[in-house]
């Protein structure tokens, strides 16, 4: 009897027990599979309009991406004590009830990205998620978030909130003592205030690229002493305070490319001895202060391409010794003696290539590596010549034949022209200066009938003779 009873119990267990060792059946629209320490539930692209009523209580991962979910009520997922990862990306969520994630005490990763209708989050949306380490709110078209939104997430390490509509760094970040990575790129952030990043003492990576940042306030990164990667590229920065990066002694990557900077100040990088990658490309930089890079002894690559630099003095690096690669293309370089040191370094190190010369004229279009600098009698460098194509010929150029003939013909015309009284000449208009010789003769009946035949014959033959004379002179 006992054997039959046990047999009946085993036969009555849900089919999911055999597949995923779960206590409840796998939802009809989902696929469940056994993973380490539980089961994985995949319900992506299932056409769901609501969260399945019953989910396996042993689930460690649930994927509900690309469905039609619009609303999450309180305890929307029931009680799932083992759940560590929940993904709700690419749905139509417009509201999340405070307490929607209660019953998920071990949740470590929550993905809500690409819910473009969400736009608003209640201050207690993430209440009770004390073990959450990764939160993805990217592309939710959020204008702002409550100051206390993340206050109950003491374990949060990584926040992805890019592709939103924030105009300032969310105040909800302040005081997140364990946050290490913050992704805030491609938004509308206009400034990094001195209080924006307060309390982020473990922050190692901050991305603010492709926003509208016009100002970085002094001391803005004062609490970020362990920051290693700072991306401020593709913003609207035209100036930086002298101590903008003070205290960032562990910074390894700094990207300031794609801004509106017109110079590089010496004070900016004074504390960045560990910096390995520095991007200053795609700005309007025309001047680099002496010693601007002198403390960057560990630099592996310096990007200065796409600026307005005409010269780069060695004193920008002294007394440091730069060992990294130098990117200098797309600048209007003036390849005179001020760049001789760079040409020599290019030959010796092989770490610099593509330095196109825009001037002087004799080397324009060449690469700096192709320029040969002359030496004066006392051994000093001599600049390449500045070509002037309009005055470069050593002597007067020969006059074109057509011009010579026309001048000779003009002279003949004057010699053959009839003399007129002074009064009549004074009344001649400027327009008559272009009249032809034949017009003048026919209109005035010059010299009487007895002189016309030889006069006309001379006027016809002499221009031809003049051409032969000029041609003979040119051949000589």
Curated annotation (Swiss-Prot):
It comes from the Eukaryota. Its main location: secreted. Glycans are attached at residues 92, 178, 295, 388, 427, 434. Expressed in kidney and retina. Also at low levels in brain, testis and muscle. Within the retina, expressed in the inner segment of photoreceptors, outer and inner nuclear layers and the ganglion cell layer. Residues 336-387 form the LRRCT domain. The keyword Chloroplast does not apply. LRR repeats lie at residues 60-84, 85-108, 110-133, 134-157, 159-181, 182-204, 205-228, 229-252, 254-276, 277-300, 302-324. It is found in: Secreted, Extracellular space, Extracellular matrix. Residues 1-18 form the signal peptide. SUPFAM superfamilies: L domain-like. Keywords: Congenital stationary night blindness, Disease variant, Extracellular matrix, Glycoprotein, Leucine-rich repeat, Proteoglycan, Repeat, Secreted, Sensory transduction, Signal, Vision. GO terms for cellular component: extracellular matrix; extracellular space. Belongs to the small leucine-rich proteoglycan (SLRP) family. SLRP class IV subfamily. It is linked to Night blindness, congenital stationary, 1A: A non-progressive retinal disorder characterized by impaired night vision. Congenital stationary night blindness type 1A is characterized by impaired scotopic vision, myopia, hyperopia, nystagmus and reduced visual acuity. This is Nyctalopin. It comes from Homo sapiens (Human). The lineage of its organism: Eukaryota, Metazoa, Chordata, Craniata, Vertebrata. The gene is NYX.
């Amino acid at each position: 009897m006992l054997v039959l009873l046990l047999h009946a119990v085993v036969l009555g267990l849900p089919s999911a027990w055999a597949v995923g060792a779960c206590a409840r059946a796998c939802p009809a629209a989902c696929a469940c599979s056994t993973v380490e320490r539980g089961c994985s539930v995949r319900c992506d692209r299932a056409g769901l309009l609501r969260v399945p009523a019953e989910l396996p209580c042993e689930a460690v991962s649930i994927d509900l991406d690309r469905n039609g979910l619009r609303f999450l009520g309180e305890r929307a997922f029931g009680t799932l004590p083992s759940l560590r990862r929940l993904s709700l990306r690419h749905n139509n969520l417009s509201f999340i009830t405070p307490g929607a994630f209660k019953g998920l005490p071990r949740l470590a990763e929550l993905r809500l990205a690409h819910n473009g209708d969400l736009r608003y989050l209640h201050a207690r949306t993430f209440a009770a998620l004390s073990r959450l380490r990764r939160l993805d709110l990217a592309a939710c078209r959020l204008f702002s978030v409550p100051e206390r939104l993340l206050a109950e997430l003491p374990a949060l390490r990584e926040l992805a909130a890019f592709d939103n509509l924030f105009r300032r760094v969310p105040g909800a970040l302040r005081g997140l003592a364990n946050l290490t990575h913050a992704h805030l790129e491609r938004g509308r952030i206009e400034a990094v205030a001195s209080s924006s990043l307060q309390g982020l003492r473990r922050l190692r990576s901050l991305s603010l690229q492709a926003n509208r940042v016009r100002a970085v306030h002094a001391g803005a990164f004062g609490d970020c002493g362990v920051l290693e990667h700072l991306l401020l590229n593709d913003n609207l920065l035209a100036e930086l305070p002298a101590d903008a990066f003070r205290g960032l002694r562990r910074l390894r990557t700094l990207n300031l490319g794609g801004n509106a900077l017109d110079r590089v100040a010496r004070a900016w990088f004074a504390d960045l001895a560990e910096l390995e990658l520095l991007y200053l490309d795609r700005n309007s930089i025309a001047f680099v202060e002496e010693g601007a890079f002198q403390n960057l002894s560990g630099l592996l690559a310096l990007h200065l391409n796409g600026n307005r630099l005409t010269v780069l003095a060695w004193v920008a690096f002294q007394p440091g010794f730069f060992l990294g690669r130098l990117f200098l293309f797309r600048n209007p370089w003036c390849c005179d003696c001020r760049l001789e040191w760079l040409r020599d370094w290019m030959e010796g190190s092989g770490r610099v290539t593509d330095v196109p010369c825009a001037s002087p004229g004799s080397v324009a279009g060449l690469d700096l590596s192709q320029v040969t600098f002359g030496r004066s009698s006392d051994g000093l460098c001599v600049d390449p010549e500045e070509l002037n194509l309009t005055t470069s010929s050593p002597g007067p150029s020969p006059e074109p034949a057509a011009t010579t003939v026309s001048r000779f013909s003009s002279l003949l015309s004057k010699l053959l022209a009839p003399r007129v009284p002074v009064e009549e000449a004074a009344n001649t208009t400027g327009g008559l200066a272009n009249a032809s010789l034949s017009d003048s003769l026919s209109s005035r009946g010059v010299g009487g009938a007895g002189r016309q035949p030889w006069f006309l014959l001379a006027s016809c033959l002499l221009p031809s003779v003049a051409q032969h004379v000029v041609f003979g002179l040119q051949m000589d």
